[in-house]
Amino acid sequence: VATGPMTTVQDAGRFGHADLGVGRSGAADADSYALANRLLANPPGSAVLEVTLGGLRVRARGPVTVAVTGAEAPLRVDGRGAAVNTVLHLPDGAELAMGVPDRGLRSYLGVRGGVDVPPVLGSRSTDVLAGLGPEPPVSGALLPVGPAPADLPNVDHAPAPPVGGSEEVLRVVLGPREDWFTDEAVRTLLSSAYEVTPRSDRVGARLSGPVLERARSGELPSEGMVAGSLQVPPGGEPVLFLADHPVTGGYPVVAVVCSADLPRAAQARPGTRLRFTLSAAAGTPPVRPTRNERQNR
């Protein structure tokens, strides 16, 4: 009926095609995505709708069972309030309306049986950067639902902490190109707050904050990128790559956000402050040579 600012079909992602220049894509908040499928007893990897900042309205054609997870958007079924993280049974013709969440960015509408659009390269995910996968749903579109799994849901509701906040602290591992930046730049990254800007999307969160000064001039040859990379363009403000990031890039990556923290990064809406802290798994940062020592080598 209505799709809001941005609604796409997403699953666990498109694996094994980076050598062809095709990224993984998939649900930006993998934790909320997985919870929707667990609530519905769907097989892992079943496709859902990823809804950015609410605004979605759908009407059931035939009885369906659904669940909404992620950003806690106000829900109404035929005008009556409904709960997130809960199994909802929609009779034929029922309308589910999703408002704008107070916090967080992305909500996930799962349906028992999964959204059964044709897969592309083994995935039903829409990659907005590469233009692969199903077209984003439009008003009036009919989305097919796959056969219901044999297993029945074990619970009707799964309590989950709210996603999204005014500030998030994300763990990082330095590198692989932290030596392209001054010591002061690395200290700045690990001690400053960066704000998510409105120019952010599924490709990456563009951040506003202290500029990271380079210790080297010139540019790198293009090299592989991963979700969580903090790439620093010439302007000095980092970009945090998310689900639809490019497969390669030529700007240096000063650090990479730990994969376990990426779901929280994906829920950071414009205006959210991000802080970065060194992951305990990374150990103590090595003592790096000063700029003079590097220049005298």
Question: Positions of the model-derived regions?
Answer:
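Conserved "landmark" site that anchors the functional core of diverse proteins
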Residues: 1-297
